[in-house]
A protein has these predicted regions:
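Transmembrane helix-loop junction
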Residues: 48-49, 65, 81, 94, ...
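Hydrophobic alpha-helical transmembrane segments of multi-pass membrane transport proteins
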Residues: 56-127, 172, 178
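Short, membrane-exposed interhelical loops at transmembrane-helix boundaries
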Residues: 204-218
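Transmembrane helix segments
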Residues: 47-51, 157-204
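Residues that define the loop-to-transmembrane-helix transition and helix capping
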Residues: 30-31, 56, 99, 164, ...
Length: 250
C-alpha cells in the first residue's frame, strides 16, 4: 500500500510538471489566443447582435463556451506540435506511463480553461443586472467542465501528428457543440431530434450546471445527472485519448 501511494505521488507530480511545461510554452501562443480567447467572443457577438437575451442565460453560455474552446485549444496545439517535432517521442521514451503523460496534458488544458472561464465570467458580471446566486456551485461547474473539455481536447488531437491536421476537426466539433448544446438556444425550444443530439454532448450538461448556479434555481435530479454525465464524459474521453495514442504510436 505504501509503495502504491508513493508511486501515485510520483505520477501526480510528473503530470503536474508536464502541465507546467505546457503552460509556459503554449498558453500564449497565437492559435491559443485566437481560438481560446477571441473565438468565443467572436461567435457570441456574431450570434447575439440584434437579439435580446436574459443575463442569466448569457453568463452560463459564455463561460461554458470559453471553457470549451480554452481547455481544448492548448491540446490541439501542444500534442500534435510535439509529435511533429519529435519531442513527444522523447517524452514517451522516458520512464513515464502514457496515462501519466495524458493526465499531465489534460491538466494543462484544465488550467487554461479555468483561466479563460474566469476572464469571461468577470466580463459577463460587468453586464447590468448580472449576478451569480450560488458561487460555490458555479465554481464547481467551471472546474468540472474544464476537466471534461480538456480531456475532449486531448482525445480529439490524439490521432493527429501535426497542428494543421488537428485544428480543423477540433474547431468543427466545438462549433457544432456550441450551437447544439444550449449555449445560445435553450434545449427545450429545439426540435425533438436536436434535443436528442444535445443530450449526447457534454457542453449541454456544463451549461445546465452553470445556469442552475447562476439563477439559484437548483433542482436535485437534473443537477445530479449533469455532474454524473460530465464525470462519465471525462473518463470516456481520457480513456479514448490513451487508447488512440497507443494505437498511433505503434
Amino acid at each position: 500500500m505504501k509503495a502504491l501511494i508513493e508511486t501515485s505521488k510520483v505520477n501526480v507530480l510528473t503530470a503536474v510538471h508536464i502541465a507546467e511545461k505546457d503552460a509556459k510554452i503554449y498558453f500564449f501562443k497565437g492559435p491559443n489566443i485566437t481560438f481560446g480567447l477571441l473565438f468565443p467572443a467572436i461567435i457570441y457577438l456574431a450570434f447575439s447582435v440584434g437579439r435580446t437575451a436574459d443575463v442569466s442565460l448569457i453568463i452560463p453560455g459564455l463561460v461554458a463556451m470559453s471553457s470549451l474552446f480554452g481547455a481544448g485549444a492548448i491540446e490541439s496545439i501542444a500534442l500534435p506540435l510535439e509529435r511533429a517535432k519529435g519531442t513527444f517521442d522523447r517524452l514517451v521514451a522516458a520512464p513515464i506511463s502514457l496515462t501519466t503523460i495524458i493526465f499531465g496534458k489534460t491538466l494543462g488544458g484544465l488550467f487554461f480553461g479555468l483561466f479563460l472561464s474566469i476572464v469571461y465570467m468577470i466580463i459577463a458580471l460587468l453586464l447590468p443586472g448580472a449576478a451569480i446566486a450560488n458561487p460555490l456551485l458555479f465554481a464547481f461547474g467551471i472546474v468540472l467542465s474544464a476537466v471534461t473539455f480538456s480531456a475532449l481536447g486531448v482525445c480529439i488531437s490524439a490521432p493527429f501528428g501535426d497542428v494543421p491536421q488537428a485544428m480543423p476537426p477540433a474547431t468543427l466539433i466545438r462549433i457544432a457543440m456550441v450551437f447544439l448544446g444550449g449555449v445560445f438556444i435553450p434545449i427545450a425550444t429545439m426540435p425533438n431530434s436536436l434535443q436528442l443530439v444535445a443530450h449526447l454532448l457534454p457542453v449541454t450538461y456544463a451549461v445546465d450546471i452553470l445556469q442552475q448556479a447562476t439563477t439559484g434555481q437548483i433542482v436535485a435530479q437534473p443537477l445530479i445527472t449533469d455532474i454524473a454525465a460530465l464525470i462519465m464524459f471525462s473518463v470516456i474521453f481520457f480513456a479514448a485519448a490513451v487508447a488512440l495514442l497507443k494505437r498511433t504510436l505503434h
